[in-house]
Curated annotation (Swiss-Prot):
This is GTPase Der. Residues 353-437 form the KH-like domain. It comes from the Bacteria. Residues 434-467 are annotated as: Disordered. SMART domains: AAA. It comes from Nitrosomonas europaea (strain ATCC 19718 / CIP 103999 / KCTC 2705 / NBRC 14298). InterPro entries: AAA+_ATPase, G_ENGA, GTP-bd, GTPase_Der, KH_dom-like, KH_dom-like_a/b, P-loop_NTPase, Small_GTP-bd. Keywords: GTP-binding, Nucleotide-binding, Repeat, Ribosome biogenesis. GTPase that plays an essential role in the late steps of ribosome biogenesis. Coiled coil: none annotated. Disulfide bonds: none annotated. GO terms for biological process: ribosome biogenesis.
Length: 467
């Protein structure tokens, strides 16, 4: 097991910057704004041969008893319970604050191993920058600069000292990868509630306020004896409504998380009509080629008439998602949630399907025999064979002649045929048409010696005859 390091401290002391340094990534959003990180954020790091897990937490406000700051404090305490080592971060430039004393007292009650880390110490002598923090009674402080990376190696060495570790074995060549699932949708549609229902614990903040999740949270879990990684993305809203710079960062992280996923569960709100923004999110998922499962949330409490309206609206506005499995769920009460994971598995398998060339060609020729492509001018396109050109999503390449004249309707006909024959449910499917190259096109055929002699004789006769 990897040791777990949890970063704790009051707002804006540099926890997310330290997280990015320790994981050698830019997975946590960093800006000079207090209260930026709200959920637990997990990342992997390594010092030499020693791997470790790092958990970034929101700014700790233990004295707040209600609202979202209280929920953030609960998240921090849950992370501390999971920790092997707690890195208590304080600000060396601002000095010891009253809130630091309150947090230190709270951490002492947990009984966990605590290391006091004085951040933002670049250019400052150790003795002067750490002197006042001895008052906290947490042992010798470690002075670091997360921004510049100073003394971080010594910090991790000290934190992992005496901790047993095992060398990680490489994955077997045929070993199946862990599917990565992104939960995406507009703000406040119930994405975090859905994750908590799937996990059976309150892992991410579920709060009735749009924009609660600002970062993309990675959570490993097992379901049905299979391992998965879930990503709770920040809610996407129209760019015109993205006022805060931080929220713009969150949108970028959301789009990156969708690109990093194998399967995306698109969550829609049954209590609000399907908007253009829902369609834009779905369009982006398709552009990136990610497999898709659609979940219409908050289905409970609707009567039959309202449900029928929602179904018709989905067909009208999101009909291009007909390839995806559609589920009507209540994330809050768990209704219909169990059906999501089989659809995720099916979509993941379809995206990684390997289809032999003979089978693809037979399916294509059977479709052509059933319905010929329409003529393009004086000639009809000829489809000769098909093969798979890629996966995730599947790419099928059709070869033939005059294929530039194949209309869009016939392309969709072939796509639907391939999807039906090979059961490619839940994944986008791309079909490319390639016309065979004629190496002699636009070139004159050279004359043989005999043909050249006869041509010369004809020209001489014509000159004599016509002067």
């Amino acid at each position: 097991m990897k040791p777990t390091l949890v970063l704790v401290g009051r707002p804006n002391v540099g926890k997310s910057t330290l997280f990015n340094r320790l994981t050698r990534s830019r997975d946590a959003i960093v800006a000079d704004i207090p209260g930026l990180t709200r959920d637990r954020h997990y990342g992997h790091g390594r010092l030499g041969l020693k791997p470790y897990l790092v958990v970034d937490t929101g700014g700790f406000e233990p004295v707040v008893k209600s609202g979202i700051l209280h929920a953030m404090a609960k998240q921090t305490l849950q992370a501390v319970d999971e920790a092997d080592i707690v890195l208590f971060i304080v600000d060396g430039r601002q000095g010891l604050a009253a809130q630091d004393k309150i947090i230190a007292e709270q951490l002492r009650k947990t009984g966990q191993k605590i290391i006091l880390v004085v951040n933002k110490t670049e250019g400052m002598p150790y003795s002067s920058v750490t002197a006042e923090f001895h008052e906290l009674g947490l042992g010798t402080p470690c002075a670091v600069s997360a921004l510049h990376g100073d003394h971080l190696g010594e910090l991790i060495d000290f934190a992992l000292e005496g901790y047993p570790y095992e060398e990680e074995t490489a994955a077997e060549p045929g070993q199946e990868k862990c599917p990565v699932i992104a939960i995406a949708g507009r703000p406040n549609v119930g994405k975090s509630t859905l994750i908590n229902t799937l996990l059976g614990e309150e892992r991410v903040i579920a709060f009735d306020q749009p924009g609660t999740t600002r970062d993309s949270i990675y959570v490993d879990f097992e379901y049905g004896q299979r391992s998965y990684t879930l990503i709770d993305t920040a809610g996407l809203r129209r760019s015109g409504k993205v006022w805060e710079t931080v929220e713009k960062f969150s949108v970028v992280k959301t789009l990156q998380s969708i690109e990093a996923a194998n399967v995306v569960i698109l969550v829609l709100d049954a209590h609000h009509e399907i908007s253009d923004q829902d369609a834009h999110i779905a369009g982006f998922i398709l552009e990136t080629g990610r497999s898709l499962v659609v979940a219409i949330n908050k289905w409970d409490g609707l009567d039959d008439y309202q449900r029928e309206i929602i179904k018709r609206e989905f067909e009208r506005k999101l009909g291009f998602l007909s390839f995806a499995n559609l589920h009507y769920i209540s994330a809050l009460y768990g209704n219909g949630v169990k059906g999501l994971m089989p659809s995720v598995d099916a979509a993941y398998a379809a995206a990684r399907a390997h289809i032999p060339t003979p089978k693809l060609t037979r399916a294509m020729l059977a479709a052509v025999a059933k319905q010929q492509p329409p003529r393009g001018g004086m000639s009809r396109p000829k489809l000769r064979y098909a093969h798979q050109g890629g996966e995730n999503p599947p790419l099928i390449i059709v070869h033939g002649s005059m294929l530039e004249h194949v209309p869009q309707t016939y392309r969709r006909y072939l796509e639907n045929t391939f999807r039906e024959v090979f059961k490619l449910k839940g994944t986008p499917l791309r079909v490319e048409f390639r016309t065979g190259h004629n190496p002699y096109a636009g070139k004159k055929t050279p004359l043989t010696e005999e043909e050249a002699r006869r041509a010369h004789s004809r020209r001489r006769r014509n000159r004599k005859k016509y002067g």
